[in-house]
Amino acid sequence: KAIDAVRDATLFTYSGLASNDATVFDFAAKAAAAGKDPKEEARKEGFKPDLRKRGHVRSAFDGRYRFTRYFSPLDHNSPQTLDQLFKWNDVELYDLAKDPGETANLALDRKKNEKLLLAMNRKLEAAIKKEIGKDDGRELPDVAGVTWGLDRIDL
């Protein structure tokens, strides 16, 4: 059976605040190397991860193409146009039939691949709607009002 016989695309998502900003690990390692408690140092220095970084992932694979959006947890989005897609996301698009090693990102040529980018974005949005429902960050921990502003880090 073809991979798309059951659904138009498979969905992969990742939302992890701890790994959204790699400077968290650098900060913790330096504090530990200095013999200090990373949590206490973070509190004293007011260190917080930069949640504007695009570390969250939504990805779809339709049997040939893998389409991935990387976005900030502060900017959950459902882009409908090419401009919106690239405004709120870092984008990857690979043709796994021709490029199984995912080395040639087709999203780098927006103009040439506009129709394919938008088609794969629609498949991704459909998979999100079907499998997640409302994709607004509610899977993230314990933040009232869905603002995602952190006042501490858990190391």
For the regions a protein language model found, what residue spans apply to each?
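His-Asp-centered acyl/peptidyl-transfer active-site segments
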Residues: 2-12
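Short, intrinsically disordered low-complexity segments
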Residues: 6, 57, 65-68, 137, ...
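C-terminal, low-complexity/hydrophilic appendages and adjacent surface loops
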Residues: 14-108
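Long, internal low-complexity/basic segments
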Residues: 17-18, 26-27, 48-50, 86-88, ...
